[in-house]
Swiss-Prot record:
Mg(2+) binds at residues 71, 144. ATP binds at residues 14-19, 71. Allosterically activated by GTP, when glutamine is the substrate; GTP has no effect on the reaction when ammonia is the substrate. The allosteric effector GTP functions by stabilizing the protein conformation that binds the tetrahedral intermediate(s) formed during glutamine hydrolysis. Inhibited by the product CTP, via allosteric rather than competitive inhibition. Keywords: ATP-binding, Glutamine amidotransferase, Ligase, Magnesium, Metal-binding, Nucleotide-binding, Pyrimidine biosynthesis. The gene is pyrG. Catalyzes the ATP-dependent amination of UTP to CTP with either L-glutamine or ammonia as the source of nitrogen. Regulates intracellular CTP levels through interactions with the four ribonucleotide triphosphates. It is an enzyme of class 6 (ligase). It comes from Burkholderia ambifaria (strain ATCC BAA-244 / DSM 16087 / CCUG 44356 / LMG 19182 / AMMD). This is CTP synthase. It catalyses: UTP + L-glutamine + ATP + H2O = CTP + L-glutamate + ADP + phosphate + 2 H(+); L-glutamine + H2O = L-glutamate + NH4(+); UTP + NH4(+) + ATP = CTP + ADP + phosphate + 2 H(+).
Amino acid sequence: MTKYVFVTGGVVSSLGKGIAAASLAAILESRGLKVTLLKLDPYINVDPGTMSPFQHGEVFVTEDGAETDLDLGHYERFISTKMRKANNFTTGQIYESVIRKERRGDYLGKTVQVIPHITNEIQAFIERGAASATCGEPDVAIVEIGGTVGDIESLPFLEAARQMSLRLGRNSACFVHLTLVPYVATAGELKTKPTQHSVQKLREIGILPHVLLCRADRRIPDDESKKISMFSNVPEDAVISVWDADSIYKIPQMLHDQGLDRIICEELKLSPKDADLSMWSELVEKLENPKHEVTIGMVGKYVDLTESYKSLIEALRHASLHTSTRVNIEYIDSEEIEANGVDSLKHLDAVLVPGGFGRRGTEGKIAAIRYARESKVPYLGICLGMQLAVIEFARDVVGLKQANSTEFDSETPERVVALITEWYDRDGKVETRTEESDLGGTMRLGSQRCPIKPGTMAEEIYGKDVNERHRHRYEVNNRFVPQLEAGGLIISARTPSEDLPEMMELPRSMHPWFVGVQFHPEFTSTPRDGHPLFKSFVEAAFANKQARGVKA
Protein backbone atom coordinates (compact mmCIF):
# COMPACT_ATOMS: atom_id res chain seq x y z
CA MET A 1 0.00 0.00 0.00
CA THR A 2 1.26 3.47 -0.91
CA LYS A 3 2.16 5.75 1.97
CA TYR A 4 1.99 9.53 1.76
CA VAL A 5 4.20 12.44 2.75
CA PHE A 6 2.47 15.82 2.61
CA VAL A 7 4.80 18.81 2.17
CA THR A 8 3.40 22.20 3.17
CA GLY A 9 4.90 25.68 3.32
CA GLY A 10 4.59 28.57 5.72
CA VAL A 11 5.41 32.26 6.30
CA VAL A 12 6.20 33.16 2.67
CA SER A 13 6.11 31.52 -0.75
CA SER A 14 9.12 30.60 -2.91
CA LEU A 15 11.00 28.90 -0.07
CA GLY A 16 11.73 25.85 -2.20
CA LYS A 17 9.04 23.29 -1.33
CA GLY A 18 9.52 21.71 -4.73
CA ILE A 19 13.27 21.28 -4.26
CA ALA A 20 12.74 19.96 -0.72
CA ALA A 21 10.12 17.44 -1.89
CA ALA A 22 12.26 16.35 -4.86
CA SER A 23 15.35 16.01 -2.64
CA LEU A 24 13.46 13.83 -0.16
CA ALA A 25 12.22 11.72 -3.07
CA ALA A 26 15.79 11.33 -4.35
CA ILE A 27 17.00 10.10 -0.96
CA LEU A 28 14.12 7.63 -0.61
CA GLU A 29 14.71 6.36 -4.15
CA SER A 30 18.39 5.85 -3.32
CA ARG A 31 17.20 3.63 -0.46
CA GLY A 32 15.45 1.34 -2.93
CA LEU A 33 11.92 2.68 -2.53
CA LYS A 34 9.61 3.39 -5.46
CA VAL A 35 8.65 7.05 -5.21
CA THR A 36 6.37 9.45 -7.05
CA LEU A 37 5.50 13.09 -6.44
CA LEU A 38 2.37 15.19 -6.88
CA LYS A 39 1.92 18.96 -6.97
CA LEU A 40 -1.38 20.52 -5.85
CA ASP A 41 -1.86 24.11 -7.01
CA PRO A 42 -4.50 26.27 -5.27
CA TYR A 43 -5.14 28.65 -8.18
CA ILE A 44 -8.43 28.46 -10.08
CA ASN A 45 -6.85 28.23 -13.53
CA VAL A 46 -7.38 24.75 -14.95
CA ASP A 47 -3.67 24.59 -15.80
CA PRO A 48 -0.80 27.07 -16.19
CA GLY A 49 -0.82 26.82 -20.00
CA THR A 50 -2.23 30.31 -20.57
CA MET A 51 -0.64 32.00 -17.54
CA SER A 52 1.98 34.70 -18.03
CA PRO A 53 5.57 33.56 -17.42
CA PHE A 54 5.94 36.67 -15.26
CA GLN A 55 3.22 35.33 -12.96
CA HIS A 56 3.90 31.61 -13.04
CA GLY A 57 7.35 31.02 -14.48
CA GLU A 58 7.98 28.08 -16.76
CA VAL A 59 5.26 25.72 -17.95
CA PHE A 60 6.66 22.19 -17.78
CA VAL A 61 5.33 19.71 -20.36
CA THR A 62 5.01 16.02 -19.46
CA GLU A 63 5.40 13.07 -21.83
CA ASP A 64 1.63 12.72 -22.09
CA GLY A 65 1.21 16.37 -23.08
CA ALA A 66 0.09 18.04 -19.86
CA GLU A 67 1.02 21.67 -19.22
CA THR A 68 2.05 21.66 -15.58
CA ASP A 69 3.85 23.48 -12.79
CA LEU A 70 7.61 23.94 -13.09
CA ASP A 71 8.09 21.88 -9.91
CA LEU A 72 7.32 18.76 -11.96
CA GLY A 73 10.52 19.53 -13.83
CA HIS A 74 12.43 19.39 -10.56
CA TYR A 75 10.72 16.08 -9.75
CA GLU A 76 11.84 14.49 -13.03
CA ARG A 77 15.36 15.82 -12.65
CA PHE A 78 15.74 14.39 -9.13
CA ILE A 79 14.15 10.94 -9.51
CA SER A 80 13.76 8.36 -12.28
CA THR A 81 9.94 8.29 -12.22
CA LYS A 82 8.39 10.28 -15.08
CA MET A 83 5.56 12.67 -14.34
CA ARG A 84 2.16 12.56 -16.01
CA LYS A 85 -0.91 14.77 -16.21
CA ALA A 86 -2.24 13.16 -13.02
CA ASN A 87 0.81 14.36 -11.04
CA ASN A 88 -0.38 17.98 -11.05
CA PHE A 89 -3.84 19.37 -10.48
CA THR A 90 -5.40 22.68 -9.55
CA THR A 91 -8.42 24.09 -7.74
CA GLY A 92 -9.84 24.77 -11.21
CA GLN A 93 -9.68 21.09 -12.15
CA ILE A 94 -11.23 20.04 -8.85
CA TYR A 95 -14.19 22.40 -9.16
CA GLU A 96 -14.60 21.54 -12.84
CA SER A 97 -14.82 17.84 -11.95
CA VAL A 98 -17.24 18.39 -9.06
CA ILE A 99 -19.53 20.64 -11.11
CA ARG A 100 -19.56 18.10 -13.94
CA LYS A 101 -20.59 15.39 -11.46
CA GLU A 102 -23.29 17.63 -10.00
CA ARG A 103 -24.72 18.29 -13.47
CA ARG A 104 -24.79 14.54 -14.16
CA GLY A 105 -26.69 13.98 -10.93
CA ASP A 106 -23.94 12.00 -9.23
CA TYR A 107 -24.69 13.63 -5.88
CA LEU A 108 -28.37 12.62 -5.93
CA GLY A 109 -29.71 16.09 -5.26
CA LYS A 110 -27.51 16.83 -2.25
CA THR A 111 -26.20 20.31 -1.49
CA VAL A 112 -22.68 20.31 -2.93
CA GLN A 113 -20.22 21.81 -0.45
CA VAL A 114 -16.49 22.27 0.10
CA ILE A 115 -16.72 19.59 2.80
CA PRO A 116 -17.19 16.78 1.92
CA HIS A 117 -17.49 17.06 -1.86
CA ILE A 118 -14.48 19.22 -2.75
CA THR A 119 -12.23 17.61 -0.14
CA ASN A 120 -13.30 14.12 -1.24
CA GLU A 121 -12.50 15.00 -4.85
CA ILE A 122 -9.05 16.26 -3.85
CA GLN A 123 -8.37 12.97 -2.07
CA ALA A 124 -9.54 11.02 -5.11
CA PHE A 125 -7.23 13.05 -7.36
CA ILE A 126 -4.30 12.42 -4.99
CA GLU A 127 -4.87 8.67 -4.94
CA ARG A 128 -5.41 8.58 -8.70
CA GLY A 129 -2.16 10.49 -9.24
CA ALA A 130 -0.22 8.11 -7.01
CA ALA A 131 -1.75 5.08 -8.74
CA SER A 132 -0.72 6.37 -12.18
CA ALA A 133 3.00 6.43 -11.31
CA THR A 134 5.25 5.19 -14.10
CA CYS A 135 7.29 3.19 -11.55
CA GLY A 136 4.31 0.93 -10.77
CA GLU A 137 2.61 1.09 -7.38
CA PRO A 138 4.83 3.48 -5.40
CA ASP A 139 5.95 2.80 -1.86
CA VAL A 140 5.79 6.52 -1.11
CA ALA A 141 3.89 9.37 -2.76
CA ILE A 142 5.15 12.81 -1.79
CA VAL A 143 2.40 15.41 -2.13
CA GLU A 144 3.47 19.05 -2.33
CA ILE A 145 0.64 21.44 -1.44
CA GLY A 146 1.17 24.79 -3.14
CA GLY A 147 0.64 28.13 -1.48
CA THR A 148 1.24 29.17 2.10
CA VAL A 149 -0.47 27.93 5.26
CA GLY A 150 -2.95 30.60 6.29
CA ASP A 151 -4.00 31.47 2.73
CA ILE A 152 -7.70 30.87 2.08
CA GLU A 153 -6.94 29.20 -1.27
CA SER A 154 -4.98 26.37 0.35
CA LEU A 155 -7.51 25.48 3.04
CA PRO A 156 -9.47 22.83 1.08
CA PHE A 157 -6.22 21.05 0.17
CA LEU A 158 -4.95 21.09 3.74
CA GLU A 159 -8.30 19.85 5.02
CA ALA A 160 -8.28 17.07 2.43
CA ALA A 161 -4.77 16.06 3.53
CA ARG A 162 -5.88 16.02 7.18
CA GLN A 163 -8.91 13.85 6.36
CA MET A 164 -6.82 11.52 4.21
CA SER A 165 -4.24 11.05 6.96
CA LEU A 166 -7.02 10.19 9.42
CA ARG A 167 -8.71 7.80 7.00
CA LEU A 168 -5.51 5.94 6.08
CA GLY A 169 -4.58 5.43 9.72
CA ARG A 170 -1.42 5.53 11.78
CA ASN A 171 1.93 5.17 10.00
CA SER A 172 0.34 5.70 6.58
CA ALA A 173 0.90 9.43 6.21
CA CYS A 174 3.10 12.14 7.66
CA PHE A 175 3.51 15.90 7.32
CA VAL A 176 6.65 17.89 6.52
CA HIS A 177 6.36 21.65 6.95
CA LEU A 178 8.81 24.04 5.28
CA THR A 179 9.07 27.40 6.96
CA LEU A 180 11.22 30.51 7.10
CA VAL A 181 13.60 31.46 9.90
CA PRO A 182 14.68 34.97 8.87
CA TYR A 183 17.90 36.65 9.92
CA VAL A 184 17.30 40.18 11.20
CA ALA A 185 20.50 42.12 10.60
CA THR A 186 19.72 44.93 13.04
CA ALA A 187 19.29 42.39 15.84
CA GLY A 188 22.11 40.19 14.59
CA GLU A 189 20.11 36.99 15.07
CA LEU A 190 17.70 34.49 13.52
CA LYS A 191 14.06 34.93 14.49
CA THR A 192 11.92 31.84 15.20
CA LYS A 193 8.59 33.57 15.81
CA PRO A 194 7.34 33.32 12.17
CA THR A 195 7.93 29.55 12.29
CA GLN A 196 6.10 29.24 15.61
CA HIS A 197 3.10 31.11 14.20
CA SER A 198 3.11 29.07 10.98
CA VAL A 199 3.04 25.78 12.90
CA GLN A 200 0.30 27.20 15.10
CA LYS A 201 -1.78 27.87 11.97
CA LEU A 202 -1.33 24.24 10.92
CA ARG A 203 -2.29 22.94 14.35
CA GLU A 204 -5.46 25.08 14.31
CA ILE A 205 -6.74 23.04 11.36
CA GLY A 206 -5.76 19.74 12.94
CA ILE A 207 -2.40 19.05 11.29
CA LEU A 208 0.57 18.27 13.52
CA PRO A 209 3.80 18.34 11.47
CA HIS A 210 6.19 15.46 12.03
CA VAL A 211 9.17 17.35 10.57
CA LEU A 212 10.05 21.03 10.22
CA LEU A 213 12.38 22.12 7.45
CA CYS A 214 13.65 25.52 8.55
CA ARG A 215 14.88 27.71 5.70
CA ALA A 216 17.51 30.32 6.49
CA ASP A 217 20.48 31.98 4.89
CA ARG A 218 22.74 30.11 7.33
CA ARG A 219 22.74 26.97 9.43
CA ILE A 220 20.39 27.30 12.39
CA PRO A 221 22.22 27.05 15.76
CA ASP A 222 21.26 24.29 18.19
CA ASP A 223 19.79 26.77 20.69
CA GLU A 224 17.37 28.10 18.08
CA SER A 225 16.45 24.55 16.99
CA LYS A 226 15.64 23.66 20.60
CA LYS A 227 13.47 26.75 20.87
CA ILE A 228 11.58 25.88 17.68
CA SER A 229 11.15 22.31 18.92
CA MET A 230 9.69 23.39 22.24
CA PHE A 231 7.22 25.94 20.88
CA SER A 232 6.19 23.83 17.86
CA ASN A 233 5.83 20.49 19.67
CA VAL A 234 8.15 18.81 17.16
CA PRO A 235 11.04 16.58 18.35
CA GLU A 236 14.37 18.36 18.29
CA ASP A 237 15.93 15.91 15.82
CA ALA A 238 13.00 16.60 13.47
CA VAL A 239 13.80 20.33 13.32
CA ILE A 240 16.02 20.31 10.25
CA SER A 241 18.08 23.25 9.08
CA VAL A 242 17.98 24.02 5.34
CA TRP A 243 20.40 26.81 4.56
CA ASP A 244 21.16 28.52 1.28
CA ALA A 245 23.31 26.39 -1.02
CA ASP A 246 25.09 27.34 -4.22
CA SER A 247 23.61 24.29 -5.97
CA ILE A 248 20.26 22.56 -5.55
CA TYR A 249 22.06 19.24 -6.08
CA LYS A 250 23.64 19.60 -2.64
CA ILE A 251 20.24 19.52 -0.91
CA PRO A 252 19.72 15.71 -0.86
CA GLN A 253 22.98 15.23 1.05
CA MET A 254 22.16 18.14 3.36
CA LEU A 255 18.80 16.62 4.32
CA HIS A 256 20.17 13.08 4.61
CA ASP A 257 22.99 14.20 6.91
CA GLN A 258 20.38 15.54 9.32
CA GLY A 259 18.32 12.34 9.22
CA LEU A 260 15.23 13.44 7.30
CA ASP A 261 14.82 10.14 5.47
CA ARG A 262 15.36 8.17 8.69
CA ILE A 263 12.58 10.13 10.44
CA ILE A 264 10.19 9.66 7.50
CA CYS A 265 10.88 5.92 7.26
CA GLU A 266 10.39 5.47 11.00
CA GLU A 267 7.12 7.40 10.94
CA LEU A 268 5.81 5.37 7.98
CA LYS A 269 7.15 2.06 9.34
CA LEU A 270 9.37 1.48 6.31
CA SER A 271 12.63 -0.48 6.54
CA PRO A 272 14.52 0.09 3.29
CA LYS A 273 18.24 -0.29 2.68
CA ASP A 274 20.68 2.49 3.57
CA ALA A 275 20.82 5.53 1.33
CA ASP A 276 23.45 5.68 -1.40
CA LEU A 277 23.96 9.29 -2.44
CA SER A 278 27.28 8.71 -4.21
CA MET A 279 25.79 9.87 -7.52
CA TRP A 280 24.89 13.24 -6.01
CA SER A 281 28.33 13.57 -4.44
CA GLU A 282 29.94 12.88 -7.81
CA LEU A 283 27.72 15.47 -9.50
CA VAL A 284 28.65 18.11 -6.95
CA GLU A 285 32.34 17.21 -7.35
CA LYS A 286 32.09 17.72 -11.13
CA LEU A 287 30.15 20.94 -10.64
CA GLU A 288 32.81 22.43 -8.39
CA ASN A 289 35.84 21.31 -10.42
CA PRO A 290 35.33 22.19 -14.10
CA LYS A 291 38.24 22.01 -16.53
CA HIS A 292 36.93 24.56 -19.01
CA GLU A 293 34.67 27.60 -19.11
CA VAL A 294 32.34 29.09 -21.74
CA THR A 295 29.89 31.97 -21.93
CA ILE A 296 26.57 31.39 -23.66
CA GLY A 297 24.16 34.21 -24.45
CA MET A 298 20.47 33.45 -23.97
CA VAL A 299 18.51 35.94 -26.06
CA GLY A 300 14.88 36.32 -25.00
CA LYS A 301 12.23 38.65 -23.64
CA TYR A 302 11.76 37.11 -20.18
CA VAL A 303 15.40 37.57 -19.19
CA ASP A 304 14.50 39.50 -16.03
CA LEU A 305 12.66 36.44 -14.72
CA THR A 306 14.87 33.40 -15.13
CA GLU A 307 12.14 31.13 -13.67
CA SER A 308 10.64 31.32 -17.18
CA TYR A 309 13.60 29.27 -18.45
CA LYS A 310 14.10 26.99 -15.44
CA SER A 311 14.45 23.67 -17.32
CA LEU A 312 16.65 25.25 -19.97
CA ILE A 313 19.03 26.69 -17.39
CA GLU A 314 19.21 23.32 -15.64
CA ALA A 315 19.83 21.52 -18.95
CA LEU A 316 22.85 23.76 -19.57
CA ARG A 317 24.07 23.00 -16.05
CA HIS A 318 23.69 19.29 -16.72
CA ALA A 319 25.72 19.70 -19.90
CA SER A 320 28.39 21.52 -17.92
CA LEU A 321 28.60 18.54 -15.54
CA HIS A 322 29.06 16.05 -18.36
CA THR A 323 31.57 18.13 -20.35
CA SER A 324 33.63 19.38 -17.37
CA THR A 325 32.84 22.92 -18.49
CA ARG A 326 31.58 25.80 -16.38
CA VAL A 327 28.73 27.38 -18.34
CA ASN A 328 28.20 31.07 -17.68
CA ILE A 329 24.80 32.19 -18.94
CA GLU A 330 24.33 35.81 -19.97
CA TYR A 331 20.70 36.87 -20.31
CA ILE A 332 20.27 39.34 -23.16
CA ASP A 333 17.05 41.27 -23.74
CA SER A 334 16.17 40.98 -27.43
CA GLU A 335 14.57 44.44 -27.36
CA GLU A 336 17.95 45.90 -26.38
CA ILE A 337 19.44 44.29 -29.49
CA GLU A 338 16.70 45.93 -31.55
CA ALA A 339 17.66 49.30 -30.06
CA ASN A 340 21.45 49.00 -29.84
CA GLY A 341 22.59 46.33 -32.29
CA VAL A 342 24.57 43.12 -31.75
CA ASP A 343 27.72 44.47 -30.10
CA SER A 344 26.62 42.88 -26.80
CA LEU A 345 27.00 39.44 -28.46
CA LYS A 346 30.56 39.72 -29.72
CA HIS A 347 32.28 38.26 -26.65
CA LEU A 348 29.99 35.20 -26.48
CA ASP A 349 31.11 31.66 -27.21
CA ALA A 350 27.62 30.61 -28.35
CA VAL A 351 24.10 31.99 -28.78
CA LEU A 352 20.82 30.36 -27.74
CA VAL A 353 17.30 31.58 -28.54
CA PRO A 354 14.71 29.76 -26.41
CA GLY A 355 11.01 29.21 -26.94
CA GLY A 356 8.46 31.96 -26.51
CA PHE A 357 5.26 33.49 -27.80
CA GLY A 358 4.34 36.89 -29.23
CA ARG A 359 5.82 39.50 -31.55
CA ARG A 360 7.66 41.66 -29.02
CA GLY A 361 11.43 41.38 -29.34
CA THR A 362 11.42 39.01 -32.32
CA GLU A 363 13.42 41.27 -34.65
CA GLY A 364 16.13 41.49 -31.98
CA LYS A 365 16.25 37.71 -31.84
CA ILE A 366 16.48 37.52 -35.63
CA ALA A 367 19.36 40.01 -35.56
CA ALA A 368 21.13 37.79 -32.98
CA ILE A 369 20.59 34.74 -35.19
CA ARG A 370 21.97 36.58 -38.23
CA TYR A 371 25.05 37.54 -36.21
CA ALA A 372 25.56 33.92 -35.06
CA ARG A 373 25.18 32.58 -38.60
CA GLU A 374 27.43 35.14 -40.29
CA SER A 375 30.07 35.10 -37.52
CA LYS A 376 30.17 31.28 -37.33
CA VAL A 377 29.20 31.36 -33.64
CA PRO A 378 27.49 28.13 -32.44
CA TYR A 379 23.74 28.61 -32.41
CA LEU A 380 20.92 26.60 -30.83
CA GLY A 381 17.32 27.61 -31.50
CA ILE A 382 14.54 25.98 -29.51
CA CYS A 383 10.89 26.08 -30.68
CA LEU A 384 10.48 29.78 -31.57
CA GLY A 385 14.27 29.90 -31.82
CA MET A 386 14.14 27.41 -34.70
CA GLN A 387 11.25 29.22 -36.40
CA LEU A 388 13.13 32.53 -36.26
CA ALA A 389 16.28 30.85 -37.60
CA VAL A 390 14.25 29.64 -40.59
CA ILE A 391 12.81 33.15 -41.09
CA GLU A 392 16.29 34.72 -40.92
CA PHE A 393 17.65 32.19 -43.42
CA ALA A 394 14.68 32.74 -45.75
CA ARG A 395 15.17 36.51 -45.68
CA ASP A 396 18.94 36.85 -45.78
CA VAL A 397 20.08 33.76 -47.71
CA VAL A 398 17.16 32.65 -49.88
CA GLY A 399 16.00 36.22 -50.61
CA LEU A 400 12.41 36.00 -49.34
CA LYS A 401 12.53 39.52 -47.92
CA GLN A 402 8.98 39.41 -46.54
CA ALA A 403 9.41 36.01 -44.89
CA ASN A 404 7.71 35.95 -41.51
CA SER A 405 5.45 34.02 -39.18
CA THR A 406 1.73 34.67 -39.19
CA GLU A 407 2.07 34.95 -35.42
CA PHE A 408 3.81 38.28 -36.02
CA ASP A 409 2.35 39.38 -39.37
CA SER A 410 -0.94 37.82 -40.39
CA GLU A 411 -0.79 39.51 -43.82
CA THR A 412 2.69 38.41 -44.86
CA PRO A 413 2.68 36.88 -48.36
CA GLU A 414 5.64 34.66 -47.49
CA ARG A 415 4.29 32.57 -44.62
CA VAL A 416 7.42 30.64 -43.82
CA VAL A 417 5.99 29.82 -40.38
CA ALA A 418 2.24 29.50 -39.84
CA LEU A 419 -0.56 27.90 -37.88
CA ILE A 420 -1.60 24.50 -39.14
CA THR A 421 -4.90 26.04 -40.29
CA GLU A 422 -3.04 28.66 -42.35
CA TRP A 423 -0.64 26.57 -44.41
CA TYR A 424 -0.45 26.88 -48.16
CA ASP A 425 0.21 23.62 -49.96
CA ARG A 426 2.66 23.30 -52.84
CA ASP A 427 -0.04 24.52 -55.25
CA GLY A 428 -0.60 27.71 -53.25
CA LYS A 429 -3.92 26.64 -51.76
CA VAL A 430 -4.74 27.07 -48.08
CA GLU A 431 -4.59 23.75 -46.27
CA THR A 432 -7.17 23.72 -43.47
CA ARG A 433 -7.11 21.43 -40.46
CA THR A 434 -9.66 21.31 -37.69
CA GLU A 435 -10.07 19.89 -34.20
CA GLU A 436 -11.07 16.60 -35.86
CA SER A 437 -7.80 16.30 -37.77
CA ASP A 438 -5.01 14.00 -36.61
CA LEU A 439 -2.98 16.82 -35.02
CA GLY A 440 -5.89 18.06 -32.91
CA GLY A 441 -6.13 21.81 -32.41
CA THR A 442 -3.53 24.52 -32.75
CA MET A 443 -1.22 23.40 -29.93
CA ARG A 444 1.00 20.37 -30.24
CA LEU A 445 1.84 18.96 -26.82
CA GLY A 446 3.76 16.00 -25.42
CA SER A 447 6.29 13.52 -26.76
CA GLN A 448 6.66 12.46 -30.37
CA ARG A 449 9.24 10.17 -31.94
CA CYS A 450 10.69 11.15 -35.32
CA PRO A 451 13.26 9.56 -37.65
CA ILE A 452 16.47 11.50 -38.34
CA LYS A 453 18.00 12.06 -41.76
CA PRO A 454 21.18 9.98 -42.15
CA GLY A 455 24.50 11.77 -42.44
CA THR A 456 23.41 14.86 -40.52
CA MET A 457 24.71 16.51 -37.38
CA ALA A 458 21.37 15.56 -35.81
CA GLU A 459 22.23 11.89 -36.38
CA GLU A 460 25.64 12.40 -34.75
CA ILE A 461 23.89 13.87 -31.70
CA TYR A 462 20.78 11.70 -31.35
CA GLY A 463 21.26 8.59 -33.45
CA LYS A 464 18.59 7.20 -35.78
CA ASP A 465 15.59 8.90 -34.18
CA VAL A 466 14.61 11.56 -31.68
CA ASN A 467 11.85 11.45 -29.05
CA GLU A 468 11.20 14.85 -27.45
CA ARG A 469 8.35 16.93 -26.03
CA HIS A 470 6.51 19.71 -27.82
CA ARG A 471 4.59 22.85 -26.91
CA HIS A 472 3.80 25.09 -29.84
CA ARG A 473 1.09 26.33 -32.19
CA TYR A 474 3.15 27.27 -35.22
CA GLU A 475 5.12 25.12 -37.67
CA VAL A 476 7.57 25.66 -40.50
CA ASN A 477 5.48 25.79 -43.69
CA ASN A 478 6.34 22.87 -45.97
CA ARG A 479 5.58 25.00 -49.03
CA PHE A 480 8.85 26.90 -48.55
CA VAL A 481 11.06 23.94 -47.63
CA PRO A 482 12.31 23.30 -51.22
CA GLN A 483 13.54 26.92 -51.46
CA LEU A 484 15.17 26.72 -48.03
CA GLU A 485 16.90 23.46 -48.95
CA ALA A 486 18.07 24.93 -52.25
CA GLY A 487 19.73 27.68 -50.23
CA GLY A 488 21.63 25.09 -48.20
CA LEU A 489 19.45 24.58 -45.13
CA ILE A 490 19.01 20.94 -44.06
CA ILE A 491 15.78 19.58 -42.58
CA SER A 492 17.34 16.82 -40.50
CA ALA A 493 14.21 15.39 -38.83
CA ARG A 494 10.52 15.30 -39.71
CA THR A 495 7.42 13.91 -38.06
CA PRO A 496 6.71 10.44 -39.50
CA SER A 497 3.06 10.92 -40.46
CA GLU A 498 2.63 14.67 -41.14
CA ASP A 499 6.13 15.32 -42.56
CA LEU A 500 6.54 18.42 -40.37
CA PRO A 501 10.08 19.82 -39.94
CA GLU A 502 11.35 18.92 -36.45
CA MET A 503 15.03 19.79 -36.75
CA MET A 504 17.02 22.05 -39.04
CA GLU A 505 20.74 22.62 -39.36
CA LEU A 506 23.31 24.21 -41.60
CA PRO A 507 25.95 22.03 -43.25
CA ARG A 508 29.44 22.32 -41.79
CA SER A 509 30.57 23.89 -45.06
CA MET A 510 28.38 26.87 -44.12
CA HIS A 511 28.65 26.86 -40.31
CA PRO A 512 30.46 24.73 -37.67
CA TRP A 513 27.38 24.25 -35.42
CA PHE A 514 23.98 25.75 -36.25
CA VAL A 515 20.95 23.74 -35.08
CA GLY A 516 17.27 24.50 -34.58
CA VAL A 517 14.70 22.19 -32.99
CA GLN A 518 10.92 22.56 -32.92
CA PHE A 519 10.64 20.56 -29.70
CA HIS A 520 11.82 21.35 -26.15
CA PRO A 521 14.84 19.13 -25.35
CA GLU A 522 15.31 20.83 -21.97
CA PHE A 523 12.32 18.93 -20.56
CA THR A 524 14.12 15.57 -20.80
CA SER A 525 17.55 16.59 -19.49
CA THR A 526 18.60 15.21 -16.10
CA PRO A 527 21.71 15.68 -13.94
CA ARG A 528 22.28 11.90 -14.05
CA ASP A 529 22.60 11.65 -17.81
CA GLY A 530 22.70 15.17 -19.18
CA HIS A 531 21.30 15.60 -22.70
CA PRO A 532 23.13 14.87 -25.97
CA LEU A 533 22.00 18.07 -27.71
CA PHE A 534 23.10 20.38 -24.91
CA LYS A 535 26.36 18.49 -24.43
CA SER A 536 27.13 18.90 -28.13
CA PHE A 537 26.20 22.60 -27.94
CA VAL A 538 28.51 23.26 -24.98
CA GLU A 539 31.33 21.35 -26.69
CA ALA A 540 30.80 23.50 -29.79
CA ALA A 541 30.91 26.65 -27.64
CA PHE A 542 34.26 25.57 -26.18
CA ALA A 543 35.63 24.71 -29.63
CA ASN A 544 34.63 28.18 -30.82
CA LYS A 545 36.34 29.74 -27.81
CA GLN A 546 39.55 27.84 -28.60
CA ALA A 547 39.34 28.77 -32.28
CA ARG A 548 39.11 32.44 -31.35
CA GLY A 549 42.24 32.05 -29.25
CA VAL A 550 40.52 32.90 -25.98
CA LYS A 551 42.13 31.26 -22.95
CA ALA A 552 39.87 28.52 -21.52
